[in-house]
Amino acid sequence: MKRLLFILLSMMSVSAALRAGNEIRTTDPQKLPATAREFIATHFPDTRIALIKIDREGGRTDSYDVLLENGSDLEFDRRGQWTEIDAERTTVPQSIIPLRIADYLKRNYPDRPVVKIDR
């Protein structure tokens, strides 16, 4: 019985250690792909990075989750292309919204701010 308990606890410890190693937390923008850094500098020029979470899957980087000081949450794929922007405390910059969608929103929802967009 003790041996079974030891094996179960060992397996749980190894599993927890492996899961913990799948996410890296930093504030260093140099850990982001150049494409993501350029995107942030272009569309959020006056906002600082509060936290970067780097998700790793199978030994390689899978995605990046960037939290800005203004509360915006930006998600990027492993190549640095944005996949989702959640700006609930502010609004999504107009420069990110495709022109056809921006025109549609302006015509049909003129008083509604865009707070979330994804691809």
Residue ranges with predicted function:
Residues L4-S13:
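Sec-dependent N-terminal signal peptides
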